[in-house]
Amino acid sequence: MMKNRFGGERLEVRGERIVLARLICLIVISLTSYLLPLTSTAQIVDAFQGILPVTDPTMKKSLNGEWRLKVVDGIDDQTAVPVEDETWGKIPVPGCWEAYGFCKPSYDKALPLTGYYRTSFNVPEAWRGMRIVLRFDGVLYGYDLWVNGKKAGQWRSGYNTAMFDITDCLKGRGAQQLAMRVISQFPGSDFDYNDDWAPNGIFRDVTLMAVPKTHLADLTIRTKNTGEVSVETVVVGKGAIVKHEILDAQGRKVGTDKVEHPHLWTAETPYLYKLRTTLLEKGRPIQTFEHRFGFRELTIDGNILKLNGQSIKLRGVTCHSTDPRSVKVISDDLTLRDMKLMKEASVNYIRTSHYPREPRFYELADSLGFYVIDEVPFGYGDKNLSKEEFYPVLQQRAQATIRRDKNHPSVLIWSLGNENPLTDICIRLGDYVKTQLDSSRPYCYPQVGSYFRRFFEGKEGKGFPSPAPIYTPHYPTTGQIAGFYQHRDRPVIFTEYCHTLGISFEDHDRQWEIIQRTPGIAGGSVWEWVDQGMPFTVLPLQRELEGDSKAGMFGYEEKVYTSKNAGFEMYGNKGTDGLLYADRTPLPNYYELQHNYARAFVTDSILTTADGTLRLNITNRYDFLNLKDNVTFSWAYSEDRDTLVRGAFSPDCAPHVSVPYTLALPVPPDASRICLLHITITDAQGNTFLHQSIPVNPSDLTPRLLAGLTAKSGDPMSVVQDGILVRAGRKATLGEMVKLVGKRLERYLLRLSADGKTAGPIAADIKTEPAGNAMHYTFSLTPDTTDTVLTELGIAFLLDKNIDRVQWIGNGPLPTYPGRYRAGRYGFWSKQQGDLYFEGNRRGVDAALLTDKNGGGLLLFCRNGNVNFEQTDRGIVVSYNAAVSGQGPKFRQTAFPVIAKEVGTVSGDFWLYRVDAKNVPQLIHDLFDHPRTIAAPFKPFVTQYDTYLMRYNDITE
């Protein structure tokens, strides 16, 4: 049944009576704008001016394209737009000024600038007699409009859509002149600033629309899982009738106010219906709308968040609008690329930090299947939140956000601001949202974790001061997730957690596993999806050529260079917090997230055969879908590098459970070889979201290597440039540079003393002895008793400069560290020097072959060891590490430190074998590829932070 929310009461709007009908709600209002009181901050207007945005393509026209622009220093909020002259430039709309050289980039807060725009447009002849409306989907930050010299409107919220009825400003036929003044600062503009770039300009679509004098002003869709549809409509004018029909995904009419046995919408089953709404006047259709919607019900049961009666887990990320070339102009292609990568990482939830996204984003979230926490934009500006005059500003922003996005099934929750103090007007805003804008969804206040916890520790009164139905604290420790947040009285969503910083992403696996098994914690969103990169074409790598060893090609810079004079600027380390680089190249952390968030997986780390079968244990972390017919496990069984058999299956496994699965293996495993079961897991939409490789009947590889290295080939040290080194640290990550200032060794490759007993502050006992045709190295290292953080401790070698490729048997292909190792899987891996993912520690290594292109070089083998590959200007440094620290999260020290005074004595052993390219043992042919067949290095950048290059002499003592 079509219902209205007014309960049959008679209401008054500006003296005009609201007319209510049982099936259709007709509200008569005037054509004038809704105006809130004029305050000292801004004229607060209804963002949509009593007009429902049209969906009929014949009733709208894009004004995107080339406009004229002049940018001047300072804020001019009084002068009308000046006459265009030769000082004006051209800019595409949408387009940010910074991307086209009109101003310099600024972070956190926009520079004080004013931009003047001019363009012209024609009104289609078919629209004569209709109301003409301009729609701006986003302009940073505040703006005023003139059409043909007449003031047409004003808006002061950069990330919100606003519309303007310009009918009375038009002049006859022909070109209409549009002028616009954009200012970057005004009272309340802080609400549009965040820990983010602060660009300027018209950055979203501009659309011209036509509406009849009698028209729809608003439309709200509500659904029940039983198939009932409630549509509330608001009509401007008298005597009109609204009719609805519901179409299924194939375009077939299935009802008008109810659908029998509806398909329910979830992120796993994003089935969309279409509501076709027709406004008729005297029996003639004068407006037609089409809105896609889904049947779903969101409820809270105690402290459990449920969708369609089922508890759900939100596997999330936060996501700024970021394009490294166009700044904040986001194309469909880029959003689709993001969402494809998210699906492949099993992400099912996006927080639109810290503002509503462009309209197309929500359409794609609806159709592809994502849950969204949609954010009302007030980021900075805390000082304003104790001032009553800013309450209407918050109301305006909430109204503009919610009215635009309320019919999207993907939007589950409204987020009110970000990390703001909970002042009186913030708390009242929540009540306003719930009672006046949308009673069907919960709202929340994302909070700094320490601030949130104060409410429960008696430091900020007693209990949380708002009835917000969901708690949304930030950055809990692993212990807090396991303790403090376990039994809250409302659902908990960590709207920011496990902050990435460069390649630091420690402990996400443990945090997510606790979230996964705790009913009252509904999920979380990792900060941040993508680096906040701004294009730059200055600061070329010439500094390196001029002898500055701390910059350019060799040395740390908080930038990504795509060429020697262009790349992405991240404003120091503030914007280097993405799972992806700004151009969407994944960092290793992306693959760690992919493994930890996986919707389905084989839980076994080792498999054994029994009666010609492998018994697997399979876990399903979908909330609604059985794996049967929805997920495919493609598998391959290999021995050494030979794949012997392949297959695929789709197990019968209900949501939230684990089941055994027996896989028939038609060939008996050869115990003398390395046997692996490789699993690739793909959903029904073709998104491959997990790769696994699991050892089958594993055994020690070392005896096989010692027996198989039959060729005598000389001293391994003949391909080593600088003798035996002690590694007592590593190249610092972004996080370590901040947290370990004065605590780490900047020169961490230490040469042995003349007697071989010390290396810098470390006592060393290193012994070598022949082992067949290899050399066996045993060592013990004892650091001094200082607070020095060593990060890595072991034995290292600078290899001959011609050695430029590595192959290894162990965990890969990405670097792995304590607290960040889940993405590593056992197998046969290879990289060439220069590859983006070349450097770093690998865990669980049994053998590593380092050669030149012809196959000459060095074989290092060990038992389940840590082996590090590092690039320098003089060649590759390979290390066998006896101790490795974690890389830490952003805000805290690593939970896995290697501190000199605490580590005591560490020891280890490994073997080296000199490989002669002209006399390679058959075993090496069996286990490794010929070096010439190794794939070319993946090198999307010239250099980049965290995997930057260093000069050997700068890191050696």
Description of each model-found segment:
Residues 138, 184, 266, 670-672, ...:
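Beta-strand/loop-rich accessory regions of lumenal/periplasmic or secreted enzymes
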Residues 49-54, 70-74, 112-216, 253, ...:
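Accessory beta-strand-rich segments of carbohydrate-active enzymes
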Residues 46-53, 59, 93-103, 190, ...:
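Extended substrate-binding grooves/exosites of carbohydrate-active enzymes
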Residues 43-135, 186, 190-194, 199-202, ...:
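Extended carbohydrate-recognition surfaces in non-catalytic/accessory domains of CAZymes
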Residues 46-54, 152-153, 173, 177-210, ...:
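Glycine/proline-rich low-complexity spacer/linker segments in large multi-domain proteins
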